[in-house]
Amino acid sequence: MFRASLPGVALYQAEYDLYLDFTYQYGIGAWRTSRMRTRLLAGQFAPACQALLDYRFMTSARKEGPGWEPYQWDAAGRPKRWRYDCSTPGNKVCRGVWTRQQARHAACMEAQ
């Protein structure tokens, strides 16, 4: 399913592995609609690596505490989904999400 989403795209093994790892974490639906995939299909490999850094948010149906911001609203204009930016320096909420994306990005750029 993953390989079929990149028809005609030749990747180094390191790139393939890290994008597949991303897909394991976020799901094939997120992969299929990602800027990474769009860039790869266009032959833009370095911008695809940069797009890895877009995935730095943790989401919730309620505001969990300070730093959470609404990003989806219901028909009445009330927040219905909240997110936290995991790249916030010193955060103790989801630091691992950001460090994992940074590691993927570094490995991707190294493969270029």
List the model feature ranges, each with a label:
Residues G29-Q112:
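Long, amphipathic alpha-helical surface segments
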Residues M1-A42, A46-P47:
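An amphipathic, hydrophobic-aromatic interaction surface with interspersed Lys/Arg
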